[in-house]
């Protein structure tokens, strides 16, 4: 086995105007009218507690890809979101090849819209865990709302600059941000 160095590693890559402003607005409207909204949060799945723990995460979410049915999400969306999924996955492959160089064989079906209302949040976390999410290597986030329409909602990484400030991703409607799934972050 030959190890490959990554001389140009960045902890995130952001592409502006990945989706047009009009398309962002259409997506939000279309998804909220056609898909089943779920209460987002850290899942509690033991015999005593089944549901959502809002101490760590409080959001609304819509799943946009077919997945195995669980009692916490639908198995099939009402519309076909494959074109959006393919656009994101194609860009993920390109970004990975040029910047991250992870050994990625395929993408999982975790395409979803997450809405953060005024008091919503997601504390420090990574996007990998045991089970199927342990295979994840790259996370993508698309900013669908103009940042002038809300306060807060910063995507921050658990990395600090020279002044000990958390690194924040610029908020720009239509942009997509890729980062390693193991990188701790919060909203």
Q: Model segments located where?
A:
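Catalytic core of non-heme Fe(II) oxygenases with the double-stranded beta-helix
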Residues: 75-187
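Non-heme Fe(II)/2-oxoglutarate
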Residues: 2-101
């Amino acid at each position: 086995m030959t190890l490959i160095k990554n001389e140009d590693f960045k902890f995130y890559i952001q592409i502006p105007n990945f989706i047009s402003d009009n398309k962002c607005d259409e997506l939000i409207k279309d998804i909220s009218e056609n898909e089943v909204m779920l209460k987002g949060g850290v899942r509690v799945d033991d015999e005593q507690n089944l549901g959502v723990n809002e101490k760590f995460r409080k959001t609304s979410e819509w799943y946009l890809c077919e997945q195995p049915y669980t009692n916490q999400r639908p198995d099939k969306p009402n519309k076909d979101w494959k074109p959006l999924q393919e656009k994101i996955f194609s860009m993920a492959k390109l970004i990975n090849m040029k910047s991250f160089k992870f050994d990625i064989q395929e993408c999982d079906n975790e395409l979803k819209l997450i809405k953060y209302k005024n008091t919503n949040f997601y504390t420090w976390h990574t996007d990998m865990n045991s089970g199927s999410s342990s295979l994840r290597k790259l996370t993508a986030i698309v900013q669908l709302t103009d940042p002038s329409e809300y306060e807060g909602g910063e995507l921050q990484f658990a990395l600090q600059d020279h002044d000990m400030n958390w690194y924040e991703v610029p908020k720009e409607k239509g942009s997509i941000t890729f980062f390693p799934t193991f990188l701790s972050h919060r909203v």
